[in-house]
Amino acid sequence: MPRVTTKTVQEMKEEGVPIAALTAYDYTSARLLDRAGADVLLVGDSAANVMAGHETTLPMTLDQMIYHAQCVVRGIDRSLVVVDLPFGAYQGDPTEALDSAIRVMKEAGAHAVKLEGGAPVVEAVERMVTAGIPVMGHLGLTPQSIYDYGTYQVRARDEEEADELRADAKRLEEAGCFAVVLEKIPAELAAEVTASLSIPTIGIGAGDQTDGQVLVSHDALGLSTDFEPRFVRRYARLDETIIDAIGAYVSDVRDRSFPDEDESY
């Protein structure tokens, strides 16, 4: 199948074909997700949570993101690989933000970067786009701002915040973003923003009218069982499968039924 590009996802919006995105953090999972048909693989700073056990995404460093992205890029043949810029890599001087994005593209072989926020990051987005780096925006619940919000509750329920989100979506589009993630906002607002933009929207907890959907792969596969938000659908219970399989292995080792004659030299 042909490789997915930023142009591909734009065409998918125009043709009304929903975009399927998932997070990936390593070679093995990226290879499987790519083969399964995921259009976009997001190397998310959520690796801090599901791979490293942190409570927030803030501890993730740029070097760590580049490492995970390198692993993912080596595992794909088709999917578009988008890499989160972590907290501290773009919030300051726009030149530093551009340098961070350049490192991700050069060292990881990524196809695009993603960053959170609206008006405050527009200049950084413009610098990246001018340099030829595709940028995905992220509005609504932005996990890197959790200590500012104080909660992971739904964002933009009140009209003032909804108006700000509408304006920020337009700002990101005008700055050159090729797509924008809408996280944990009312479905009606997400549908309105999606209709108002010429670029694709990717929803997570934002209803079914966005141009695509993204989930943390560990959540979709039933590996993060201590985190069960309303917007997640479990497509497997791999936690149970893995526990059962390893339990069987341990049992076979204990009773010396593994290895058997066929598994020995």
Swiss-Prot record:
Cofactor notes: Binds 1 Mg(2+) ion per subunit.
Cofactor(s) demanded: Mg(2+)
Binding positions (Mg(2+)): 45, 84, 116
Reactions catalysed, as given in the entry: 3-methyl-2-oxobutanoate + (6R)-5,10-methylene-5,6,7,8-tetrahydrofolate + H2O = 2-dehydropantoate + (6S)-5,6,7,8-tetrahydrofolate
UniProt keyword list: Cytoplasm, Magnesium, Metal-binding, Pantothenate biosynthesis, Transferase
GO biological process entries: pantothenate biosynthetic process
Positions bound to 3-methyl-2-oxobutanoate: 45-46, 84, 114
Pfam families: Pantoate_transf (PF02548)
GO molecular function ontology, one term from the record: 3-methyl-2-oxobutanoate hydroxymethyltransferase activity
Pathway assigned to this chain's UniProt record: Cofactor biosynthesis; (R)-pantothenate biosynthesis; (R)-pantoate from 3-methyl-2-oxobutanoate: step 1/2
Gene3D superfamilies linked: Phosphoenolpyruvate-binding domains
EC number(s) given by UniProt: 2.1.2.11
GO cellular component, one term: cytoplasm
Subcellular compartments: Cytoplasm
Subunit structure: Homodecamer; pentamer of dimers.
Family: Belongs to the PanB family.
Identification of the protein by name: 3-methyl-2-oxobutanoate hydroxymethyltransferase
UniProt organism field: Salinibacter ruber (strain DSM 13855 / M31)
Gene name in the database record: panB
